[in-house]
């Protein structure tokens, strides 16, 4: 027998040792490949069987219907509810990514008192004690609630001894409500029937992104703009900035910032003179003729006459206005002007339709200013902040964070944020996936929100309404009598809905049908409106933002992370912005002509300074912006919102003033900026490679005329569509289906929801900014953006 170590055993031991070294280098906590090795006994389930729950998306106030697929009682994928009348089975990118709110590791896992973990019992004791001590000097700050939550909070404040409720939404539509009140006597938002329009004149409203219900708008716009019967309806974008919405337009009319209202009135003046309608407007509109407003708007006289002729020839017209880019201190006046244009063109009750029920008016940003004043003076002893993030979202000049030092702050929230970091007491709340609620986003649309799974392990959270209800009942035994939890309260509200819709059956069967369907959806009823004569008292002025006294700053909103509430979702950070193709960052859009005059290269680091603050970000050349303006998207620049959000980009709100319009909403546009070159190069990651097709015919296009005559080329030459040899001769290989995908790129608006859905469906990992920069793009679907042409006549194509 040989002594010593054989060659075979040597390699064997080396292999074992190498494997041991690899294992030792991994994380200490082993991954559980089989999560249910010991199945739970407290509920029944069938392994690998999918169940769908109908609920409501709460990523924004659009409140789309949602269908959540679960397996083993875990939520796995969100899709749109096909039964819902608004989104009809679709979801936007934020809706697709909403699952990351549920499983986010940066959720609050337990109550915190001054940043230290405490048990729930102690947290509730502190909460009830401060409610008693406040003696009605309470303020409740939360997002606008269209469902039962609003009345619940009002009743809770009464039970707690009194107080005030203030709604906060940075992207509110209150200016539009105010304009509609002046124009039609209705302080609510109408239905915009895109599909009924022959021409859309859009005055800076980003209706495919963050204006109204973008999912519904996208569907209806696609129907309106589709090629049908040899023709295609027109969409003209009238704005100082081309957003994703503007990129889908047939024509861009560049205007001076803040002059949307003047252009709308000039077009209305021409149309009114042609059809001789609304005689009471004759003298009023004469002051806004194309000849009189051309210099102020920067739009040639003949162009405004062309737009009026288009509206007459290709009607019905749909004129839209509002959004960030037009949010000057004259927002209300601008929107009244758009309403006048719709009225004189005959759009009312055709493409602009009001419901028979009016929506309740909500608070505005002036109410928030008063709240800050009350905090500073010590009038408010207890401030409850429900999920919103005003510390991040408000301009620093309002000194909201400093005012919090004068009161006791309780934050009831699921996610970490700058606001929860500033609170004295944090009570972790459940997400919308784990709790009950409802929403009534439109007349006749009653949507239910139900828990689709139990609370995620490791997060000791409670429903925010149950937290409030428990506290109220511990103080006032008569509070919410007969309600053991918020579900009881909610069901009583829905009993009233059952009676209203005429359902005479048992409530149990009615409730089950509501949960199965996602709500109760009644047929919309409309009420005719007419233009109020008092619109002639509204004066639309030139804001004077196109001179050489600095560049006008246009804060825009990303369709991905919105106002910043989506910044801690890695899918939304890693999916490239459809226009800039930039990931994990902020940028400053600047016209190439302006940049070259200032000696600023594309992708250079520049310093942006306004009278209110200064930030550094990357310059991004964009033909689609006025030469005397720059644009910076909102939503980045977080400091205490979780590891995904923190440290990326800048917060544009740090550059803005606290000036407001006549409706009490922030005048986001009106701040002048100076630029300074800091560095010739920046580390900004974008995925487009080259914005030009370089003759490769990747994103082909044709004209309606050629298509109608049959002269349009099919777009390329036949190429193999698969790597493998054809197996059509193999019996049964393509039965029952042969998989394929066809995408109508003419209807695609670049919303990127498909890319986020790809991450969700296939459990694709994110790699972060650095690895994306070296080509580690993990999504199985790419959305390529190509630029054609130069200057104001450029064109954007998606492929």
Predicted segments, located by residue:
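N-terminal export/assembly segments and adjacent metallocofactor-ligating motifs
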Residues: 1-275, 283, 291, 300-302, ...
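Domain-level signature for respiratory redox metalloenzymes
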Residues: 2, 67, 138, 192-199, ...
């Amino acid at each position: 027998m040989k002594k010593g170590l054989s060659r075979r055993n040597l390699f064997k031991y080396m292999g074992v040792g190498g494997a041991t070294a690899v294992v030792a280098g991994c994380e200490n906590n082993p991954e559980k490949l089989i999560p249910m090795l010991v199945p739970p006994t407290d509920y029944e389930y069938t392994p690998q069987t999918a169940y769908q729950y109908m609920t409501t998306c709460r990523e924004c106030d659009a409140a789309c219907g949602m269908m959540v697929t679960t397996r083993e009682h875990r939520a796995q994928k969100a899709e749109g509810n096909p039964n819902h009348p608004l989104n009809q089975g679709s979801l936007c990118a934020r809706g697709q990514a909403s699952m990351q709110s549920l499983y986010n590791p940066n959720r609050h896992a337990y109550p915190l008192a001054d940043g230290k973990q405490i048990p729930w019992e102690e947290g509730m004791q502190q909460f009830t004690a401060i409610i008693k001590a406040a003696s009605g000097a309470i303020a409740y700050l939360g997002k606008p609630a269209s469902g039962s939550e609003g009345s619940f909070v009002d009743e809770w404040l009464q039970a707690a001894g009194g107080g005030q409720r203030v709604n906060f939404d940075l992207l509110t539509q209150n200016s539009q409500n105010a304009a509609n009140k002046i124009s039609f006597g209705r302080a609510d938002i109408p239905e915009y029937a895109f599909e009924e329009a022959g021409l859309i004149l859009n005055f800076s409203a980003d209706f495919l992104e963050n204006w109204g219900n973008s999912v519904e708008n996208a569907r209806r716009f696609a129907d309106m703009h589709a090629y049908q019967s040899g023709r295609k309806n027109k969409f003209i974008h009238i704005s100082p900035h081309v957003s994703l919405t503007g990129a889908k337009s047939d024509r861009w009319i560049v205007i001076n910032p803040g002059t949307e209202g003047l252009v709308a009135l000039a077009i209305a003046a021409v149309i009114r003179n042609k059809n001789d309608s609304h005689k009471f407007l004759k003298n009023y509109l004469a002051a806004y003729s194309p000849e009189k407003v051309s210099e102020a708007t920067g739009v040639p006289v003949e162009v405004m006459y062309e737009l009026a002729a288009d509206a007459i020839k290709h009607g019905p017209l749909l004129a839209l206005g509002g959004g960030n880019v037009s949010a000057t201190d004259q927002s209300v006046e601008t929107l009244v002007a758009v309403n006048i244009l719709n009225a004189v063109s005959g759009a009312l009750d055709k493409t602009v339709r009001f419901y028979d029920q009016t929506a309740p008016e909500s608070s505005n940003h002036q109410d928030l200013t008063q709240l800050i004043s009350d905090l500073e003076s010590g009038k408010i002893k207890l401030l409850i902040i429900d999920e919103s993030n005003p510390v991040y979202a408000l301009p620093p000049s309002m000194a909201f964070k400093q005012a919090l030092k004068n009161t006791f702050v309780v934050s009831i929230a699921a996610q970490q944020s700058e606001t929860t970091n500033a609170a004295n007491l944090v009570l972790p709340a459940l997400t919308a996936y784990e709790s009950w609620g409802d929403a009534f986003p439109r007349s006749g649309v009653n949507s239910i929100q139900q828990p689709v799974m139990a609370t995620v392990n490791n997060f000791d959270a409670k429903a925010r309404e149950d937290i409030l209800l428990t506290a109220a009942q511990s103080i006032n035994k008569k509070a919410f009598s007969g309600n053991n939890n918020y579900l009881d309260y909610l069901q009583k509200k829905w009993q009233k809905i059952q009676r209203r819709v005429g359902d005479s059956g048992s409530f149990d069967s009615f409730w089950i049908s509501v949960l199965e369907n996602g709500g109760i959806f009644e047929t919309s009823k409309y009420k005719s409106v007419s233009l109020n004569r008092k619109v002639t008292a509204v004066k639309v002025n030139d804001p004077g933002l196109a001179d050489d006294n600095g560049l006008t700053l246009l804060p825009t909103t990303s369709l991905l992370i919105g106002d910043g509430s989506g910044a801690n979702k890695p899918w939304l950070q890693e999916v490239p912005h459809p226009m800039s193709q930039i990931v994990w960052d902020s940028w400053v859009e600047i016209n190439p002509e302006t940049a070259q005059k200032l000696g600023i290269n594309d992708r250079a680091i520049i310093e942006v300074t306004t009278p209110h603050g200064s930030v550094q970000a990357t310059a991004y050349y964009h033909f689609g912006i006025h030469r005397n303006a720059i644009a910076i998207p909102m939503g980045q620049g977080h400091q205490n919102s979780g590891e995904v959000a923190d440290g990326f980009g800048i917060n544009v709100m740090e550059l803005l003033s606290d000036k407001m319009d006549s409706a009490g909403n922030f005048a986001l546009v009106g701040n002048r900026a100076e630029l300074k070159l800091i560095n010739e190069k920046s580390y900004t990651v974008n995925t487009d490679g080259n914005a030009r097709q370089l003759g490769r015919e990747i994103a082909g296009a044709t004209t309606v005329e050629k298509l109608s005559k049959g002269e349009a080329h099919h777009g390329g030459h036949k190429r193999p569509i698969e790597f493998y040899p054809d197996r059509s001769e193999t019996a049964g290989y393509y039965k029952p289906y042969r998989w394929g995908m066809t995408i109508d790129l003419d209807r695609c608006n670049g919303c990127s929801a498909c890319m986020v859905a790809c991450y969700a469906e296939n459990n694709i990992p994110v790699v972060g900014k650095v690895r994306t920069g070296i080509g580690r793009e993990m999504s199985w679907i790419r959305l390529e953006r190509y630029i054609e042409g130069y200057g104001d006549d450029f064109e954007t194509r998606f492929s």
